[in-house]
UniProtKB/Swiss-Prot annotation:
Family classification: Belongs to the peptidase A8 family.
Key words, A-Z: Aspartyl protease, Cell inner membrane, Cell membrane, Hydrolase, Membrane, Protease, Transmembrane, Transmembrane helix
Name this polypeptide is given: Lipoprotein signal peptidase
Organism ancestry: Bacteria, Pseudomonadati, Pseudomonadota, Gammaproteobacteria, Alteromonadales
Signal peptide per UniProt: none
Gene name tied to this protein: lspA
Originating species: Shewanella loihica (strain ATCC BAA-1088 / PV-4)
Amino acid sequence: MPSSWKESGLRWYWVVVLVFVADQLSKQWVLANFDLRESINLLPFFNFTYVRNYGAAFSFLNDAGGWQRWLFTLVAVGFSTLLTVWLRKQPKGLWRLNLAYTLVIGGALGNLIDRLQHGFVVDFLDFYWKTSHFPAFNIADSAICVGAGLIILDSFISERKPNGEDVAKG
């Protein structure tokens, strides 16, 4: 374990702040400028559309009656805490995992604030093809997905030396 936070993955916590601020500013802009379900077409496959998500990814448990708000709050706090502990234990040089963890934490905290403040998550990025729409999402969701993808990628392409340095597999 690194001897100080400066030598640990916590040095990457600026990514958490960046994701969180970008996510919250974008959602505040949507709330200030859009009515619920209002949509503005930007490209032939992309709209800004304000929707409320009471569930999780892809509106999972969206209509569950309200208890899911507290479940997802606990999950966000739990994962953010766990990933922060892991960041403290790993060297700052493990850039892929440190970036992944901080993206997930920033996204989780962005959506957590929505749940606590509004009781729902503000989603607005709406991609579609003809009449088929992908579920709307936000910057926090994107950060969580990219972070999860990096964690999976890292598990396939990296091995660690005893000092924590990455070594390519194969």
